[in-house]
Amino acid sequence: MLFKNEDSGNGVYCFTYNNFSDVTISDILNIRNDNKNNDNEDNKQDDEEKNDEDDNKSNLLLEENEENKRQGDKPFEDLSLFSFKNNEQCYDNIKMQQAILNSSYEKNVKNIVKIVYHEDCKLLYENTDIHVELPSIVYGRNRNKNNDVVNKCNQYNDDDYTNKCNQYNDDDYTNKCNQYNDDDYTNKCNQYNDNDYTNKCNQYNDNDYTNKCNQYNDVRKITNLKYFINHNWKNINLINEKLFLKNLKELEEILNYNFLHICKNKCKQYNKKRKNERHFSYHDNFLSHYIIYKKNKFIKHNKNEHINGNHYDAHESTNTYDEEKTREKHNNKNNNMKYCLNKYPYDNVNAPLNLSCPWYEKKIENIYCLNIPGYKYKYKYICPSMSKMNDEKIKELYIPKGHILFNSKFESGNLKYVIKEENDKEVYSLFLNPDIRMNEKKNQWFYFSASYVPNEYYTNELYKMKMCNKDINHIGDNMNVVYNYMNGTGNNINNIVNNLDSTVNYMNSTGNNINNIVNNLDSTVNYMNSTGNNINNIVNNLDSTVNYMNSTGNNINNIVNNLDSTVNYMNSTGNYLNRKNNNHLSYTNWSGQRCMNQYLNDINNDEIDTNLDGNRKYSLDACDKFTVRNVRKLEKPFTVRFKIENMAKPFFLYKYGHSPLSFSECKYKIENIQWERNSYDIKYIKNSSCKHYNIKKNSMEYYNYNTYTLEFSYDFTYAYDTVYFASSYPYTYSYLSEYLCLIRNLLKDHPTINYIEERLCKTSCGFDCPVLCITNYDRMEEYNKEELKESVEKKQNIVEANNTCDEKLVDGMDISSNAIRKEIKKKGYILTSKKLDKNRVVNNLFVDMKNGCTRGCASGCTNGCANGYTNGYTNRYTKGCTKGCTNEYSNDNMCKECLDIKNICYQEEKEKCDIIKYNDDKDYSHNCCYEECYNMKREKKKFVCCLSDKCNSFLNEQIKRRRSIMGWNILRNRIKCCKNKMYTSNDFMKTFDSLLKKVYVCKGENKKNNGTKIIKRFEEKYDNNLLFKRKDEKRSLSASPKKKKKKKKKIIVLTARVHPGETNSSYAIHGFIAFIISNNIYAHILREKFIFIIIPMLNIDGVILGNNRYCYNGFDLNRQWSNPIGYIHPTIYSAKLLMKNISENNKIIFFCDFHSHSRKYNCFIFGNEGSYNYVKNKKMCEVFPEIYSHTLPWFALVDTVYKADNENKGSARLISGKEFSLDCSYTFEISLFGIQIRKDFNIMYDEKKDIFYVQNYFEGYQNGDDNIKGGDNIKGGDNIKGDDNINGDDNIKGGDNIKGDDNIKRDDNFQRDDNFQRDDNFQRGDNFHRGDNFHRDDIYDKMNKHYINNNYYYDKNSYDFLYFDENLLFMTGVSFGICLFKFINFLSYHKSSICRRTCEEKEKEHISTETCGILCAKNNKDDEEKCNESKKQNHDAFKTGNSLEFDKGEEHLLSDTHRMVNTFLCNSMNKSKNKNKNKKGYNYILNKYGFIKLKSSKKHIEEVKRIRKLKKKKYMVKEVYELGRKIKQNKYYHNYPFGLYKVNINDVIRILNKINMDDPNGKYKGPGFNNSVDMKKKIKNKNESKTEKKSKTENKSKSKSKNKSKSKNKSKRKKVIVIL
């Protein structure tokens, strides 16, 4: 559906000029040149006067031409009267006037104002109905209002003129000329074929042009631009295809190797108690090794200073810094840091995974995405109503002769216009195109290109030919003179032709006379003999007439040729050059560059595509493409300063000097350098006033809102180079479609992966929104006995293998017989020995790779497997791989210790006995995911990895070797056990198309029932949406019959790119898709148990148009999930409808929406505050982020926030969590810039700490094993055992809780971040004592020093910074998939501890958390014990914000976590720094602001109920709610619903205490407070007498003495818990 644009209509317009006023843009912007001198000004004035004279001359010529138009053909009548003798003079006049015109044009070009800007043009995108505005480059001044000149000049392309010129090729004239075959006439005719004109045309045949092929910067024109673009796009697709296959290969090798190592280490620890399951924590952390390698490489690369160009400002690179001193200090403290890369500090792991080898790091580094910019352009369609419009009406726009020319016509480009400052410096002010229907003219995403064109281009022959060509738009308005003169010459030609016809007729008459004379010669022979002399005279006269005719004809030909040379000179020479040098042109040797010297370039001249509707397609190309051979590097870089003046966000990481991205075409094709950040002098400044140039009004407009300017400099190092600039890595819709096409071809007819790609919906612009559904095919449900017996017979040769295996065994299989060898060759099994002749096998496949892989192994791996992938993926996924691997595996240089993909070859046929379990006695209900797939021996020294059968294909199960043959009864019983655990998905995949159909429309909620119908629908199936059942339900089901053998797979939904400017999210989902479709063990296990539904791009329209946040209709799609409209928000509506249809029969257990963040570093997650299920008294929604923090080194757990319901209303995370009862509903945020990591970071980490902002316990490891043992266990004295971990959840005897995330200071001063600093040794009573060797200052060295406004800024003294690139973003998506595996693994292991809590339990949970904030004194041990007990029971105790730290301070301190207290109490407390404050002082502060301290927690619920009964509570609750919105606090603790508002109960009590002034202590008296009589009694009058007061007090004292017991009960009810 089309929506009218506010700025323009829906009609499609041709490209027209706008009427500009005489005021230049430089006057409007008040641009001044500070470097002007008086002498220069005088010189410039003289130049301006000369230029004005030239302009006046050109204007006079234009006026004369206009008069000539009005008079018609009168000025050409004189030319028609020219005689044949004056034709040469006519030709000379043409040359003279053309020279004058060229000279005047060259002067006028120099005098063009140095301002380049863009104007909007309307167009339609290809195959859509969208109406788009795009910028176009125009001149600064001296333009005509209309483009009639261009249209009239194009008339010479018609056939009328060519036919007139070709009239003289008829046979009549040629026959007449050929009648005279005498040698005299032929010689005379051939005189005009001399080398005079041919040499002029054949000048390009000389060696001058051929020599130029070897010159630098050889510019050549592209004749077939359409073929050139398509050819380049095909080459890019081939590169992406090879990269895609290589990424899958490298990814499979890394993940399979990692998984097998973990299984080996896990096998060695079966005999030990798995109390904490440490293999979960150390699982899959190979990226920790890689980040150190990446960081060191980045620092070495950035130590070199930037290339010195013609800088005009002093430059200090913000990205480079010297950190050698800080690193030396850190290494001196930690002498054992160098060993950290080779070994884990984990004593139980005897053979750790060594991932610091160079080959491993290079394999990870080679995995990346490549999106080459600038090869997809936007198209224009002429509407059917305008199909009658001639091609001549398409206007062409003018561009000046400048050094920098801009373009944004490619996909996702959003440049509006550019203004060049009027000085000698290359400084450009850029204005971005805002989002459609956006009120504010600003943007945050930018993507444009700038081309550097040297001066030599304008003196080049190609440019000269262009000036003589029909491209009169380069000549400007002065070409009117040429047009008028050409009309005059055309009339002269017509007159000459008419005269020629008269001469021809005269010749015919003379010829007839000659024939009559010849006929009479026979009769008058005798007479002619007498008069022979007279005939000779006549013949001579006849020859003279013929010669005269030939001369006139040649003159005509010369005139025609000269006219053609002026009009079509470039076409003729270009065709000649193409004919002459076809053999020299090859696209492979080109460095194809672009220069924006032409706006409209119709690449479909020969073939115009016509649709059924009659629409004619034209390509909009913002540049005049040409190729450049032998591009030369500049001796001195050409520096340009860019200023983007309408940036939107006030806080952006550009403030810290981070550079935008740039992509140079020359560097990519010559140096193979892709996107890089090499800009410098970066500034991000707030503008004093917001300005925007309105091209329609030709004036600068000023607005009230704020905008910001991003300034940066760039050095062009190559001539004719085109550089693309972007705020983040661009990821276009076309690149996504090509990527999905590669996946379709790869997974076509795949034996195991069930891949479906469907269209979710059509977007508003008419594009297809893809949705992916990925899982594995179901296993066979029934097994034949015969097949099982055959499989058992095949296992007869299986024997038990120890660490040392027999020489004649292939991984536990006997290969001595020839029959088994033939079977091995048929099925593609690979021997680990070098040659098949040698019956020796290397059985230890998991030897640590100390020296890495040798050259032969690396080369064989890359060559052999790459060939196998390319040849075998289309037909059979694994066939080619086995062939390629077998050919290369026989290489003598193969490294034995390298576990490669060759050792994990894939079997073509699946065997049915592969799902057998071998432990009948063991209960698998609470087993881990990889335990189900790998059933290994419990013995320490008996481990064998099977490379046969399914382990050889998918490594899903480990079949043990036994000497005895398994019987059929044992096998049958184990198959029954396996059948109960099967998961099905084929039915779901078959009906997936029906789920996408729009059966009904989501309507709004009913006002009467407040949406109870919709809620009721989900309540009916509420239990089905739960991840796990309750404990009571499990007990009740114990006596019930067994469940069905089939289990439906659960659903995981992932979405991305709802905001177009957040491109990093697309790269992350790109990496996850590559992970889930690859043939690695993690992905295979996930596909076996889950169905993945992925929507990789939700806002396709905004991505194509270059928007930052909004869609085509001007809506933020991430705020429309609550009530989407099908025809306005089609993608959101269809996605939500799909999830609702799925939830009817299946379970959605996980949802994540990928986003990007512009104000923070690293990666983090936003989750929902409420949670339904709990794991070990911990919310299930908090488990996944913690697991992710241990796997991904650049994940910041500190920035992970669980937001409330009233924040980000309508977001996908919130709505999916509410409506589908999802605990795990997240928003995954990735920084747009990079990673900020501490300099002391290493691969060691603590399970309960964040590795980025809290230092590890590794520093205590330097002083020996007495203080620290076991990595995470601390032994500081005899009273604390090594198994007691120090964290927020565990209690230490005789002391308080020690939290790893909280920092402690000794100064006894309360700080905002709940941090305390201690300079002495850390002591906790008599039970806990830490030695002097363990320094707390080294461990917690000002952790929160750099915390400002919830953002961590870049401090190069404490942190290292690393930019995100395609490699890191890709691996972020891969690690997300690994964390999903670990998360499911964790839940499957702790399945018995998962429970669901009701609303009452949640209220009790809130109450228990409140006890953590009770104000406790030092000597009050009862309160401390209660607080510790509440921390044990509640999972919220491990948070830093909810816990209260206790110190040696004499008085209790208030916490600043409460959002209403910190503004009042903290200020007053900071003023009073005396240590000896009494409790009365703090109680006075509490009573002053209406806070009461409660002792019992049960009264809290009673007070909530009592407040809800109040009749006039609305006003007070509303006041509290509005006050909370003004403060804008992100954390909301202990909120309770009161009517329509959800507020903090303590805030309500504070308001009630202010109203109730009767009680001196500031307490209110319950529900009786609403009575009007009581209210009147409570109001005190200042004018009351003292006697009345005394009488009242006496009466009160009597009543109090009688009812003491009653007053005590009432006072207990009045007290309320203060939640801090």
Curated annotation (Swiss-Prot):
Binding-site list for Zn(2+): 1059, 1062, 1155
Reported biotechnological use: Possible candidate for an effective malaria vaccine as determined by epitope response in sera.
Ranges in the topological domain labelled Extracellular: 1-1367
Glycan attachment sites: 19, 56, 102, 354, 487, 508, 529, 550, 571, 589, 687, 802, 1010, 1064, 1141
Keyword Repressor applies: no
GO cellular component: cytoplasm; membrane; microtubule cytoskeleton
Keyword Membrane: yes
Acidic residues bias (residue ranges): 44-55
Name by which UniProt lists this protein: Putative zinc carboxypeptidase
Lineage: Eukaryota, Sar, Alveolata, Apicomplexa, Aconoidasida
